[in-house]
Amino acid sequence: MASTTGTEATPSRISLSQDHLGILHDVKVNTASIEIANSLLQKNHEEWHMFFRDRAGHNHISHSILTCLALGGSPEDIQRAYDDGLEIQRPMPPLDDALVARLGDDNVMYESLGSISQYRSFLAYFQHHMEEHGWKATVTKYLFSHTKLSEKMLARMYEGAYHPVIHLGLGFEFQQPAIVAEALAQAAAHDDSNLYTYFIACEEESEIAYPLQQAKTLLQIMADASSSKTIRNAPHWEDYGNKMRDGVLGRACRETANVASKFVIRKTPESLRRRTAEMIDTCAYVAASSQRSGRKRKIDFFYMHMVTSSLFFSVIGEQDWIPLNDRIRMVEWKARLDVAWYVVCGCADIQQLALTAYNDPVTDGMGWEELYAAVVKEHDDGHVSKMIRALKNGQEAARPFENGPYRNAFPLHGDMWLKAARMTLGTTTGCDEDTKFVMFTGFDIPWETRPDLQ
């Protein structure tokens, strides 16, 4: 994993290579951009906490820089990506050397999970483990060894609206052990909304279910969740930021698991590829088409995360050093969590016409190249650029299936991908961070309190 400067990427050193600059390979990345990205990613790695606040405060700097780079950003664009995320960051927490020395004991690690103040200690431990055993062996031990600890760690990868698994996917995609170490430390330190219980409940429900003659599509499963009064009414507006933990999982965990468990992938590489593409397609369709009649178009903040994280399951699917069954399990968990997030946001009405009829004066006529060039200039924390890149990946992933025998599982097809990308830029350009997206779009209150969307 040597970079353009010949320096090896290590668990503590960022060193990007021309050989690993993103899954799409659809733009030229210049050497100067790589060099400044290396410098700024290293600075972020050494100086800034993974959490700018303890609750729902993820450091997006590496996401923004790597996405900007993969979209062909100039050195100035890379610097902008860093600067836009800088003001809110806080310094690394203190290193607890005594804890680091004990984290090799799985019981100590297990009992320490959820300690955000120990992020730096987790990071130091995972870096040390990688230096001794290699980064792939470390990932295998802590995510795929099927121990009590690794099961909890794998579930925690999906916490915080998918942020740790996004981070992990970036580490895989750009072949950066230091980013992978950050992802493992982020998952270990993250607060817990009880996703582990939900994922295990889904697997238990799947094991006892009578096999369906024909597998349900992910979109059908989401519709089934919406049609259940118990599930649909589980999240309350008054749950605020805890609609997943206290709402869906607190009031209807088993019921939601029963419905979501119907997303099952046969144990073949072909099925993994197709159903990963279906998951990506469905998430993009739901995010772009969940709109409010009579209001300006605005994408939901959490549905957006369903899309931005989806790209990394294409990346994970290509990691043949991970056992096939574990890669399949990760995609099953992703799709089942997508069902829960669909419910968290109020089971929004899905209106295809809201997407197919979309136009705006900013993005009309833009192709992918023009969208890339525009979005890397946007003042943003990486969400908009990540979504556009994920949509392009979705177009490529879904293309082999959208006109074949499984076409009903792929509601987004043809030029709808480009329309969705135009909507992503057109509805966010020029907006401040608080108005780029709408939160919990299926509820009335977000729309009633947004005069800008009248």
Swiss-Prot record:
GO terms for molecular function: oxidoreductase activity. Induction: Expression correlates with the formation of the sclerotia and thus the pigment production and is directly regulated by the cluster-specific activator CPUR_05433. Pathway: Pigment biosynthesis. Its cofactor is NADPH. It is an enzyme of class 1 (oxidoreductase). Keywords: Oxidoreductase. Pfam families: Questin_oxidase. Its EC number is 1.-.-.-. The keyword Coiled coil does not apply. Belongs to the questin oxidase family. Baeyer-Villiger oxidase; part of the ergochrome gene cluster responsible for the typical purple-black color of the ergot sclerotia. The ergochrome gene cluster produces several ergot pigments including the yellow ergochrome secalonic acid and its derivatives, as well as the red anthraquinones endocrocin and clavorubin. The pathway begins with the synthesis of atrochrysone thioester by the polyketide synthase (PKS) CPUR_05437. The atrochrysone carboxyl ACP thioesterase CPUR_05436 then breaks the thioester bond and releases the atrochrysone carboxylic acid from CPUR_05437. PANTHER family: BAEYER-VILLIGER OXIDASE MDPL (PTHR35870:SF7), PROTEIN, PUTATIVE (AFU_ORTHOLOGUE AFUA_5G03330)-RELATED (PTHR35870). This is Baeyer-Villiger oxidase CPUR_05427.
